[in-house]
Amino acid sequence: MRPLGVQGQPKSSRSKLARMGWNSFIVAAMIGIPLLLVFGMELIGRGTVHETWTWLTANWKLFELNALIVFLVFVLIYCIIGSLVMSAGISALLLSIVSLISYFKVKLIGEPFFPWDIFLNKESMNILPLVTTRTALVRIGLIFAIVAVIFLFRLWVPRLSLRPVTRVVLGALCIFALYSFGVRAPWVGTLLDRAGVNEIVWNQQENYGTNGLSLAFTMNVKNTIVPKPPGYSEPTMASLAESLNEMVGPSTANAASGVKPNVIFIMNEAFWDPTLLPNVSFSEDPVPTVHRLQQESTSGYLLSPQFGGGTSNVEFEVLTGQSMSFLPAGSVPYQQYISKPIPSMASYFKGLGYKSAAIHSYEGWFWNRENVYKHMGFDSFQSKDGFQNPEYRGDFIADDEVSKSIIKEVESNDNPTFIYAVTMQNHGPYDDHRYGSDNPVKVQGSLDDAARDTLETYVHGARDADSSLQLLIDHFQKSNEPTIIVFYGDHLPMLGYDYDVYVQSGFIHTAKSDQWSLEELKKMHSVPFVMWSNFDMAKEQVPVLSNSFLSAYVLDRLQMEKPAALAYNAELSKKIPGLLRNLVIDSDGQMHASVPASAAADVEKYRELQYDEMFGKQYLAKYTGAPSTAAAADPEGGGAVPNAGGH
């Protein structure tokens, strides 16, 4: 399509004016489109024009950096497809989708969209049922309408043509610039410093809110690589191994002689005690079994690294003894880091002659469990397909079915059994009326109708979870095989958008997580755990314990020999029982936003041990006489094999 002429002028003059006008339009579009896209992206996340404009005017240099990144993406897409309008439309669609995903993640679990979320292809579909509210659908519809209008401009706007060589060179420059932003090349570091960029790695919601989505997302690319701790070296690990050998010695001497109980870990989906909510009452006790065990048995509270989701990260901490605190915020080890055998509780018990079995009542591919469990040394993995005609409650297999599978697994083995079971029934969201209107436990208190419905649905599931625990206890009370059950939730449930139930009840004072006190942060990450056994064990109360220290604690209670790394965990937990990225709790119960100086050296050793095992040279195995990483997880070279019908 030719540029239109201008009447009353000679043809050559009209053509020249038209070209000048067209060139001006191109320049304006190349500058204006990225600015508008950044404003739109931030508007999606911030919710109002006022909040977006306030951020823009207070942080105009950050706004310009976000626009520069979007400009590079826009030009790169143009270099690929060669159409200005199509590039604008595709850029708008792509970046709007990223903004929407980040918006929903923040609303539901308090985390923005990270670079590594791109690789959660199947898992990402799990968010679809969560975005069907009217407000969400309006946002999605509006975005697609705007993109459609942009594409319509193709009918009137002439095609901007550049020679293929020019497009290749320009595209390569864009890729180089984006890569430089991702790895923070020196020239980018200088640019960011001059703009006053403050990367808030310990609080990613604040990081995105302050720096803008495009810039924060790009800065997180470099965090996909876990850096080597400054003090990590073979001499350092050899010295640490020597002290660990001294710890392991007494532990071995105190180990229970010859008794090998069945050890059953049950991580119940989103299990939490709803009676902890203030200003809310229930028609009956929703979790009587857990409340009874809190009085009769060892119990306490686990400090979870997650809220509302990210179940596999809790598994990672419990099964390996490693901490999410030393990995990039928002990362998923099951997807990103575990691609080879790694020592775990499964391989530990397998080495003692146990059958190590994993059970999960959902898809085996979810969070890459099928592969990860093999690397951890599980002998078998029963996923959703391994359940024979199971009962469903709502959309998911009932927790009772998991309890029955646990019993069947133990009964079918001649050797003692280690089981790690993960339930699914009470997965959120809870505004779906999955059980109909007949909720056995009624809720009263300072909640609106929507929040009350959400809480009643959740409580129904928590009640079923509690009942499924009692089913196991009833069975193993009659068993002659010594058995211990460790029952806990992976994280608190996401009870509505913006922590709705928690805010309305007064459990927290605001939906803005970056404004929570340390006490509120602790409450929002503390889940109850209980232990039960059919043999005598002294009762203990545990005020706080990180998930990464749970395995070492259980082995201590069983008086079983601990691997060197878990021996260190046991000692560290006496000084720092609670360790999250932005919350540290010491042995006196004092809360800190970061590791106190008195424990910094000990925590750094923990970081070095984790790096050595996951990414380093496995010096610890060399100097403690422990099996190598591969042998620890797969001592016979077989790995995990699915049960019949399982994954």
Predicted features, each with a name:
Residues 109, 117-126, 138, 215-225, ...:
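Short alpha-helical interface patches
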Residues 118-121, 185, 210-214, 237, ...:
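Alpha-helix initiation and N-capping motif
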Residues 72-73, 258-260, 479-481:
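Short hydrophobic "helix-edge" motifs at membrane interfaces and signal-peptide entry regions
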Residues 182-265:
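Membrane-interface segments at or immediately adjacent to transmembrane helices
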Residues 249-255, 268, 273-647:
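Solvent-exposed soluble domains appended to multi-pass membrane proteins
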Residues 109, 115-118, 208-213, 308-309, ...:
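Membrane-interface micro-motifs in multi-pass membrane enzymes
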Residues 2-207:
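Transmembrane and membrane-interface helices of multi-pass
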